[in-house]
């Protein structure tokens, strides 16, 4: 582990892979099987609101999946899920947190990847201020913590992830060799048997430790 440091002097332990400067992702990246996109998003960069980092944990959801919002069909709330790939699907969870998802597959498919955690690398001071007195490893280690840290709100539902204010970039630097492991999804009551949680192996920034094999 190495450490990034905010201007306030707060050290943040990192994997040592460094801050990647990959190329921006395009719509074709998201216009694929949601499970392939989920696995490939691990190690990619995510920036928004003056903060961001590298995606280290995601989960995939599809309309045929009982845990997916689209399982019950199209509604006003989930309409963005049925739109084009590369859009942000943001929803308010349990009246507490905004959660950020990336819409995937061709229009009408209703599939998305939930961004569960990032390793914070950019704009540490801004994220620390938004999160309060959070410990560095707690800044973005959960889908609600993440959106609070970078400032994603419900009004960003339907925004494109392919253009400002979002910036999602391909794996670069040491992250091109990231090992991705899968496990059952967490925080849901249906579809718990599917191994559609994808994480960067050995990351200290996951929302919850991976189960022991």
Which residues are covered by each model-predicted region?
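Conserved, well-structured core segments that form or line functional sites
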Residues: 2-213
